[in-house]
Amino acid sequence: LIEQLNSLNMSLIVTAYTQEGIVIGADSCITTNFTQEGKELYKHSHCGNKLFLLNKKIGISTCGDAIINGILLSSLIDQYIWSKKEENITLLQVEIDLKNIVNNQAKGKEYYVIFHICGYENGKRYVSKFDNNDKESHIKDVSERDGCIYDGQVDIVDLFSQDVAYRGTDGLYYDINIERCRYNELSLQETIEYVYFLISTTIQHMRFTYKKDNVGFPIDILVIMPNESLWLQKKELHIPGNY
């Protein structure tokens, strides 16, 4: 008897924006936690879709709850993208719509989904990081600054971007100097490699530790440029080679 079931894609999504374009990356792991006969168990899937392209110009990525009231979030987003394929939709409207999709499907139950959306409008570069419970818009014009946002299992990524200290034998804490990423100098190819590095390093770190494997291959990579977009890496339906 399964007493409780929760499906999370609390994995890792990364969106980096530099002079030549925006690069979005997402892993494919979905962790299902459940209680059976009083024991807490979990299962992994490495087929989760968390990265999407709307009308060849807007990138969407997700982490958090992967199943909303019995329906895969990826299925809900795919249906939404199909319904908007003929529309000249704005980032602001996408932000509003994604919140409504989750909250309407939730039917009063509590769910937590983080979204990244990004793209170009009127020659300007925009990114947004929000969750389904946010009441305000978080769209930011980042045309004049380069950087990176990330969500999900972020503890390893934090080591490359956040201030870190260690505790000495004297009980005092000492700062460790972090070499910041030179976002403003990165080419588009370097930005792609950087996003892939952050996600793949997190996956490999979990492999060699006792951490639960909440992040896993394959990694999907989407690139958005001012006048075009392209999938550099995207999972496809296939017959598994081991059968």
Where do the protein language model's features map onto the residues?
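N-terminal nucleophile
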Residues: 5-243
